[in-house]
Amino acid sequence: MREIVLTQTGQCGNQIGAKFWEVISDEHAIDSAGTYHGDSHLQLERINVHHHEASGGRYVPRAVLVDLEPGTMDSVHSGPFGQVFRPDNFISGQCGAGNNWAKGRYTEGAELTESVMDVVRKEAESCDCLQGFQLTHSLGGGTGSGMGTLLISKIREEYPDRIINTFSILPSPKVSDTVVEPYNATLSVHQLIENADETFCIDNEALYDICSRTLKLPTPTYGDLNHLVSATMSGVTTCLRFPGQLNADLRKLAVNMVPFPRLHFFMPGFAPLTSRGSQQYRALTVAELTQQMFDAKNMMAACDPRHGCYLTVAAIFRGRMPMREVDEQMFNIQDKNSSYFADWFPDNVKTAVCDIPPRGLKMSATFIGNNAAIQELFTCVSEQFTAMFRRKAFLHWYTGEGMDEMEFTEAESNMNDLVSEYQQYQDATAEEEEDEEYAEEEVA
């Protein structure tokens, strides 16, 4: 089977991870003790993608939980699904990274890395046919960003031919927790460009907007935000876990979504958006799903897809629906909005359909777009980075842990290169449109 090992790093990564395991366990009818209580053979058929069977018929998540301070671990442990995880797979330090990328990467985090890699190896060895690794982390803090990227490079060294897929929570301009976020994020993106295969860029600002605008929640909590992220995460792996008419897996996604190796930063979306614990009253049609899915308000990254063009798109539908209708709708969207799709990739939309919908919905769709507008996120971080770095503000916290200023300069220029690469393909599409219009005028 095609197993996936999930590594959750830092406070943010662990909270998202814990929520994700709740969602997955619910879909496969596994209770908080790891026991199966379902009535469908489909739930058990491929349960070993995310779980392995322990003694006594208990199903244990293939999860590695890492943090440099014990607080989050304790709350996951005492949370609703805390007893499901293997106790050996909780690895925590004592002193925390203090929002410092250098601590997570070079000092505190580096000391823990070997014991984390031992657990990762153990999990990988218990797989029949390991598909790849998923990592949840935030880029604004110290552990998720510094130690998270360190683990990615270690995993890449040991498993060079396996897919590494990250769910990275980027700092957003309006919702800021820490002053040094731009430093941590830039240093992390520098690593992700080189070592990850697929990065799903999610940011809190977009999630807050979805909660207040679409779900009409007066005071959204992190629990509500994590609910949205976990819905997307579950959608991405759904084809591996349940049978479907058109399957996708992490590798197929990468092959269809990444036109050039560095451009692997995706904006995810989900439709229909529902708040925690609510039921949907009306079944959506495939047309409405497709419409919602491409709507800028449904994107989980705070950048407007209409400002860029889609290089590639993947759409994963869930629920019973006629394939023909799905194909028609996807064609219509591309046909009506052809200016938003790069026309030098002929068929740049990958579709997958899985028959089993998520709990409480008749059908749903997960959207993954590789859009040049994602550069807005990086540009915003880059501007803040430059403003601080020009004055060398807060730099002593990093150099004190053994970092060199040169690393900052390298990371900055690598991220700026990424922005200009996206811009270049954006411009290529715009130029082609102008040429076509010019040619039409000449003919006329």
Curated annotation (Swiss-Prot):
The gene is TUBB8B. It comes from the Eukaryota. The modification Phosphoserine is found at S172. It is found in: Cytoplasm, Cytoskeleton. This is Tubulin beta 8B. Tubulin is the major constituent of microtubules, a cylinder consisting of laterally associated linear protofilaments composed of alpha- and beta-tubulin heterodimers. Microtubules grow by the addition of GTP-tubulin dimers to the microtubule end, where a stabilizing cap forms. Below the cap, tubulin dimers are in GDP-bound state, owing to GTPase activity of alpha-tubulin. One of its GO terms (molecular function) is GTPase activity. The keyword Transport does not apply. Gene3D superfamilies: Helix hairpin bin (1.10.287.600), Tubulin/FtsZ, C-terminal domain (3.30.1330.20), Tubulin/FtsZ, GTPase domain (3.40.50.1440). Its cofactor is Mg(2+). The MREI motif is common among all beta-tubulin isoforms and may be critical for tubulin autoregulation. One of its GO terms (biological process) is microtubule cytoskeleton organization. Dimer of alpha and beta chains. A typical microtubule is a hollow water-filled tube with an outer diameter of 25 nm and an inner diameter of 15 nM. Alpha-beta heterodimers associate head-to-tail to form protofilaments running lengthwise along the microtubule wall with the beta-tubulin subunit facing the microtubule plus end conferring a structural polarity. Microtubules usually have 13 protofilaments but different protofilament numbers can be found in some organisms and specialized cells. It holds the Pfam family Tubulin. Residues 421-444 are annotated as: Disordered. Some glutamate residues at the C-terminus are polyglutamylated, resulting in polyglutamate chains on the gamma-carboxyl group. Polyglutamylation plays a key role in microtubule severing by spastin (SPAST). SPAST preferentially recognizes and acts on microtubules decorated with short polyglutamate tails: severing activity by SPAST increases as the number of glutamates per tubulin rises from one to eight, but decreases beyond this glutamylation threshold. Glutamylation is also involved in cilia motility. One of its GO terms (cellular component) is intercellular bridge.
